[in-house]
Amino acid sequence: MADKNERAIKVVAENRKARFNYAIEDTIEAGISLTGTEVKSVRSGKSTIAESYADSRGGEIWLINANIPEYLQANRFNHEPKRPRKLLLHRKQINKLMGAVERQGMTLIPLKLYFNEKGRAKLLLALAKGKQLHDKRETEKKRDWSREKGRLLRARG
């Protein structure tokens, strides 16, 4: 049996550019439907969600363009690396997210792919609005200033 320290949340993939390219409005945790070889490949830590997004098809939400490479030890029963993957959400959550996407022109982007305490694959999904170029520049200036401020405070002692 694993200790409590070993059962902590294990982040496997992170979309680091998402917070720079989008203004995050709301986040929601969703389960993700994976096959056996996909789970093993995700556990190895080689999956990427940097250029992926979520979209609705037939009243369900799907993760599009997420790259989970083929599992090396699997033979002919391997999975397709960029196939759409179903996200597991309650109907109320799906309606809320799709309403925001359709009415307010928002986007669903994944922020993190991780395993929770129970060992289930979860995806932190964000309801976001794309930033304009000047907003990105402003974010970069704020980040640079906060770094510079920290350096100055450390130098003064």
UniProtKB/Swiss-Prot annotation:
Keywords: Cytoplasm, RNA-binding. GO terms for biological process: trans-translation. This is SsrA-binding protein. Pfam families: SmpB. It comes from Rhodopseudomonas palustris (strain BisB5). It is found in: Cytoplasm. Its main location: cytoplasm. Residues 135-151 have a biased composition (Basic and acidic residues). Residues 135-157 are annotated as: Disordered.
